[in-house]
Amino acid sequence: LIHPTAVIHAGAQLHPTVQVGPYTVIGERVKIGPGTIVASHVVIDGWTEIGANNRIFPGAAIGLEPQDLKYDGSLTLVKIGDHNLIREYVTINRATLSGEATVLGNHNLLMAYAHVGHNCVLEDQVIIANGVALAGHVYIESMARISGVLGVHQFVHIGRLAMVGGMSRIDRDVPPFMLVEGNPGRVRSLNLVGLKRAGLAESTKSHIYSSLKKAFRLLYRSQLTLQQSLDYLSNEMKQEGSPYSNDYLTHLVAFLVNSCQSNRRGPLPGRSTGQLLERNV
């Protein structure tokens, strides 16, 4: 299971079922769980914890120092869950300040040459395509899809089931359930394909699908300000039997409200309106 040319520090903790390919280097403080397969020419170092049944492809570099001049050599972490695919030459840097972590959840796919900067958090079932660069402190919610060859600014949040088109520049938050594309990035439409694949177009959940479409038109195609749109949606969600009363819309509204706080980047605007440039909702 361990190729004789692999260099594994005696202090590393590898489950007996872990496979390690030729010329891979694994550092002293690394922990790797059962069933994980590490291919050839991989470097895993630092305080890195990797769960079960992951596949790490040739050339990946995980747990090395952050690309941050503030880093002083402190104990910082990379935590990776289970069932992730980490393809060729992916880089995942550990966090910057003592005790902090860069986190990758479960069932994620990081395609070749993707970069996950320090302190990033990727939840579950996220797909990051080839050549994507995530700056520090980017947070990506579950089931988001990030197309290839694009950059995401530090501290940006990308919402659940969002879709980001290739070669975009993402410098502000991407709201959940939206399709975003462009340089600079703009909200173009609902992520209709993603919502359908998630089952929201089925008859039992069609009211959720319909409510999100109505909310999109209100937020991005009306003449209302963001504050007015959010006030309207918040009031509607409180009404008994309202079609706007569901967990998906609640999450969208909460995301936008939080995004507009002074410590956040603010949400991306729509393609033809500037209303989402407002802050401090």
Residue ranges of model-derived segments:
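Structural signal for interior beta-strand "rungs" in well-ordered beta-sheet cores
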Residues: 1-186
